[in-house]
């Protein structure tokens, strides 16, 4: 909105010329989201505590100390992330850009599904929430619409192509299967972040790191000069997603202020499903879906641990891990929560560097 207001004045007042630069608006978006989080956070947490007298329902079969340490902590803090990201994005992006709206659809749509899930968990006082089938159908519909939208904005042959990291000029044509592929990327990213969100600060920092990587990727592939130099597939218009990712980073940092151990609020499915959807949407738009699996490798491993646990238990009646997802396995082994969280952050940072390396190694 501010971009649209300032752009016509850029010729008369040189300060307004700053609004033309994605880098300036990205920094402003990050700071705006951070400030919004700080301003809204305390009041939102007080309100959530007042309406959620028992806090987030805790799994009875989970680590025993969760029943003692985390009981009574309110959930649905993802509302704060969505509000800060949404306000900042609307203020600082070029609202004529279709990629921004497609990614916002995924973010807010998946956040809405998570909100309904959290609400049902609280109202029924159990950990079930929305039926799994209903949740997946909702995610599939929103993901499919967003993927088709993004495909319609992208030039051929990129619109339906899958780029392979490390290999230049290699584009696998998916054709009419691309919307289904994009849908699966969005759903997979969303649910992977959701599974990772089990300890204070565990999911939000890897999300911030991934958003930082994709802010850079969006800037590079949206810029003809940089995309040509690095031999990346140029996707005109995706530079605006740098502003969105920056807003996401600011909102994530603001949320971490309140989610740092011991957490005053949990993001709930409202936040985790939305964050994963946002990352998936940016990856689809920038044609870096496989790089997302590298940068978000922690989320991938957490998801695989659940799949392996369920599959092996159904086949043999035995468990591979003491408890899934993987972070609970280490809890059961006696690792302190802070140790697990910080080590997982370090792994995320290393994976982010690996993902960034694919941009140069060709």
Swiss-Prot record:
Its main location: membrane. Coiled coil: none annotated. One of its GO terms (molecular function) is metal ion binding. It is found in: Cell inner membrane. The keyword Metal-binding applies. The chain crosses the membrane at residues 28-48, 72-92, 100-120, 134-154, 170-190, 201-221, 241-261, 265-285, 290-310, 339-359. This is Phospho-N-acetylmuramoyl-pentapeptide-transferase. One of its GO terms (biological process) is peptidoglycan biosynthetic process. Catalyzes the initial step of the lipid cycle reactions in the biosynthesis of the cell wall peptidoglycan: transfers peptidoglycan precursor phospho-MurNAc-pentapeptide from UDP-MurNAc-pentapeptide onto the lipid carrier undecaprenyl phosphate, yielding undecaprenyl-pyrophosphoryl-MurNAc-pentapeptide, known as lipid I. Its cofactor is Mg(2+). NCBIfam families: mraY.
């Amino acid at each position: 909105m501010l971009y649209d207001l300032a752009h016509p004045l850029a010729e008369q007042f040189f300060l307004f010329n700053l609004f033309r630069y994605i880098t300036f608006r990205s920094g402003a978006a990050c700071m705006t989201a951070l400030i919004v989080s700080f301003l809204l956070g305390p009041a939102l947490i007080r309100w959530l505590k007042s309406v959620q007298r028992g806090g987030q329902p805790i799994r009875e079969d989970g680590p025993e100390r969760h029943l003692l340490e985390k009981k009574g902590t309110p959930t649905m803090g993802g509302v704060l992330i969505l509000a800060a990201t949404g306000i900042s994005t609307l203020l600082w992006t070029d609202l004529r850009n279709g990629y921004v709206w497609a990614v916002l659809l995924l973010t807010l749509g998946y956040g809405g599904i998570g909100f309904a899930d959290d609400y049902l968990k609280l109202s029924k006082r159990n950990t079930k929430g929305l039926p799994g089938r209903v949740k997946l159908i909702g995610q599939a519909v929103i993901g499919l619409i967003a993927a088709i939208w993004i495909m319609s904005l992208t030039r051929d042959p990129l619109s339906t192509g899958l780029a392979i990291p490390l290999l230049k000029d290699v584009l696998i044509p998916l054709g009419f299967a691309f919307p289904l592929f994009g849908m699966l990327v969005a759903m997979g990213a969303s649910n992977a972040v959701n599974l990772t969100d089990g300890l204070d600060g565990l999911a939000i920092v890897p999300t911030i790191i991934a958003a930082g990587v994709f802010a850079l990727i969006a800037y590079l592939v949206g810029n003809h000069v940089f995309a040509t130099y690095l031999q990346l597939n140029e996707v005109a218009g995706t530079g605006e997603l740098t502003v969105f990712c920056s807003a996401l980073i600011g909102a994530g940092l603001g949320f971490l202020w309140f989610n740092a151990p011991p957490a005053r609020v949990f993001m709930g499915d409202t936040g985790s499903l939305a964050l994963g959807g946002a990352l998936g949407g940016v990856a689809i738009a920038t044609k870096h879906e496989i790089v997302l699996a590298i940068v978000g490798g922690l989320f991938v491993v957490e998801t695989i641990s659940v799949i392996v646990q369920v599959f092996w238990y159904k086949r043999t009646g035995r468990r591979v891990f003491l408890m899934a997802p993987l972070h609970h396995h280490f809890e059961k082994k006696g690792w302190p929560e802070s140790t697990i969280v910080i080590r997982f952050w370090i792994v995320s940072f290393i994976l982010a560097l690996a993902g960034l390396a694919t941009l140069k190694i060709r």
